[in-house]
UniProtKB/Swiss-Prot annotation:
This is UPF0260 protein Pmen_1776. InterPro entries: Puta_zinc/iron-chelating_dom (IPR005358), UCP006173 (IPR008228). It comes from Ectopseudomonas mendocina (strain ymp). Belongs to the UPF0260 family. Pfam families: CxxCxxCC. NCBIfam families: PRK05170.1-5, PRK05170.1-6, PRK05170.2-5.
Amino acid sequence: MAANSEPFWKRKTLAQLDRDEWESLCDGCGLCCLQKLEDEDDGAVYYTRIACKLLDLQTCRCSDYANRIKHVPDCIQLTPAQADQFQWLPPTCAYRLVSEGRDLPHWHHLVSGDPDAVHAERISQSGRMLSENSVAEEDWEEHLIFRAG
């Protein structure tokens, strides 16, 4: 009986989550919507502060989530089937944490109850991003913020 009192992310695998549980894991940091560059020599993935054209630069939410694939065909859609590849996600990402059997951080909205905590704790890049429409792709390297992995 005690196991059922555990939050869903502690008692279920990613593959066992229903759609609402899956979507609720997203903390709204927007980091997965930042443009990334891959080092050709070692395969390392680097995040830039260049945001997808659909990402709201303040709220860190997609401005057209339901239709994002139509507007951004290469938009990354995370699924439980990809869990073994989540190492490219930020170390704070709930999808990555749960896939690694780890708990959610204290600021995550499912723990804290505060959807703005991700911004207050400066986990998100809210207010610190640039739209991909404002930076030439050849200049993205000038805007690296961290290495994934």
